[in-house]
């Protein structure tokens, strides 16, 4: 299995266009050691030619330009992107579908809850209906494994996770199963497994077992502390109120990751305020000392 990180930041990217927090100001002026990042999305493949896109960020055009394997150039109009899987209906994970309209019809896999949001609150399925067949909806049934045509060896098993629907969704304060999923992606040829959960709000025993049995885990790294938005003065909500598990301290994701013998542990979907973006920070050093990597745009993993 080939994994390519198209984007590794949370909504707004890094630096965020209107933000002058220490991280954004620092990367913009070159006064901190940090990499600029686009909004989170990854691509997976079994052969390095045909790819499944996991989430479609607003930065998708630039991401696919940087990702050379996405354009095999076999004919006048071409792409290596075969299908899109949506983990949720967040704007930073779905607005890229509008940019992909020239490639319609496009197969899009998502849960019924996500499909409801994307036909009502943000009706992208309706908007693109007249673009050469539009978005072709394939329902993801939580807890039921599925395969995608063209990917003989990859199996996708969705898992319901605790998180939050987007602010525009009627499910925001009335959560439903299927608002957010994680994916277990199994390569039956190599017998390797990826656990991907960029919107993880809680880690329970089941998720710990799945992560322990995986060869690579790539999970939510939005915030270092639960009150980071408040402490930096850029917001009023905690990470948990937004559906994101913080990294540090008791109950943080790092305390769980440290219990795993999983070969590769990666944090993705990183907010612009998170100190781990500064590669000279003590927080970045702490992750490195514990064998946890910080995803960056263009990161490549082979399982």
From Swiss-Prot:
A Gene Ontology BP annotation from the UniProt entry: pyrroloquinoline quinone biosynthetic process
Matches recorded under Gene3D superfamilies: Ribonuclease Z/Hydroxyacylglutathione hydrolase-like
Keyword presence, Methyltransferase: no
Keyword match Transport: yes
Pfam family, one: Lactamase_B_2
Disulfide bonds: none
Function (record text): May be involved in the transport of PQQ or its precursor to the periplasm, in association with PQQ biosynthesis, but is not absolutely required for this synthesis.
Protein family according to the UniProt entry: Belongs to the PqqB family.
Name listed for the protein in its UniProt record: Coenzyme PQQ synthesis protein B
Taxonomic placement: Bacteria, Pseudomonadati, Pseudomonadota, Gammaproteobacteria, Moraxellales
